[in-house]
């Protein structure tokens, strides 16, 4: 059985960001592999952040128009199990800000993985290879040069 993995918002966003073709390709592969293996999970928070990140700004700067962002969010909710916060996630996130010095949003995402028993968090926003509690963080974009 594949390791259960939590997908961070940045992977969802890069899937639609043509400005970074290498990251777009990797994000697409990560999501396809997650669907094929049934191992990937997405936090409620990441769906909310995805819609905001891809549809903000003027028309010329948006990755997706608002309707397309909503449609893609709906597709993610069909394709992946969505993990929702409860009081235990919120309490764990509060501890994560203190124990690991994480921002509130990063601590909340980590806490979602920790509480739901997800072993791996895929993100470029954490320290690659570090264990946060029982959750291992892996950055799938490490092979991409910083300029792309």
Predicted feature residues:
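Acidic, PIN/NYN-like endoribonuclease modules and their adjacent C-terminal/linker elements
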Residues: 2, 110-148
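Hydrophobic helix-cap positions at the C-terminus of alpha-helices
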Residues: 33-34, 76, 96
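Aromatic- and histidine-enriched alpha-helix N-cap/loop-to-helix transition segments
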Residues: 42-48
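Acidic active-site catalytic centers that drive phospho-/nucleotidyl reactions
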Residues: 8-10, 49, 106, 125
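Active-site neighborhoods of divalent-metal-dependent phosphate/nucleic-acid chemistry enzymes
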Residues: 79-121
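Short, well-structured N-terminal submotif of metal-dependent ribonuclease cores
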Residues: 1-42, 59-67, 144-147
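Helix-adjacent hinge/juxtasegments
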Residues: 54-80
């Amino acid at each position: 059985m594949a390791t259960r993995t939590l997908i961070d918002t940045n992977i969802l966003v890069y899937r639609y960001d043509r400005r970074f073709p290498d990251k777009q390709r990797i994000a697409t592969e990560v999501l396809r592999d997650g669907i094929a293996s049934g191992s990937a999970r997405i936090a409620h928070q990441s769906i909310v952040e995805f819609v905001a990140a891809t549809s903000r700004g003027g028309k010329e700067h948006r990755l997706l128009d608002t309707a397309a962002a909503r449609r893609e969010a709906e597709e993610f909710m069909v394709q992946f199990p969505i993990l929702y916060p409860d009081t235990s996630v919120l309490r764990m996130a509060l501890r994560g800000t203190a124990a690991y010095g994480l921002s509130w949003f990063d601590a909340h995402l980590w806490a979602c993985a920790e509480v739901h028993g997800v072993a791996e968090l895929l993100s470029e926003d954490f320290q690659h290879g570090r264990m946060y509690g029982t959750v291992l963080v892996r950055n799938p974009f490490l092979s991409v040069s910083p300029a792309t």
